[in-house]
Amino acid sequence: MANYDASSINKSKKAVRTYRDLDLDFTRHPVTNDVVKIEDVNAVKRSVRNLVNTQFYERPFHPELGCGVRDLLFENFTPMTGIFIRRKIEEVLVNYEPRANISSIAVNEDADRNGINVEVNFYVLNLPNPVSVTTTLKRIR
């Protein structure tokens, strides 16, 4: 049985789709004085991090877009709280980030820093390497 990959079958020069987003740090490009663009894996990682940190009704004209994990941060951390956070993160990423195929989500309590560490492992479409995004959720009053 022969092994074929996409580049040997597809004769086009560009077989992989690139993803571009604006850099939300609004850094200025030194030559064009425009906002710098982030590409490929960095764009998807930024999008995943933003979706996890977004609350419902936070984005104008999109009240349905959000994760809602900040509501669970004021509860006592139990194994069920970790499961609820994992489910909310998985739900928002499946619904609003089609570029990422989730492989695992790890939720760990950080009692010393009063936060919860979340690690999302996923594959970007058309790329073979796994990608990991780690963020810390903290209680903000």
Enumerate the language-model features and the residues they cover.
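Short secondary-structure junctions
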Residues: 94-102
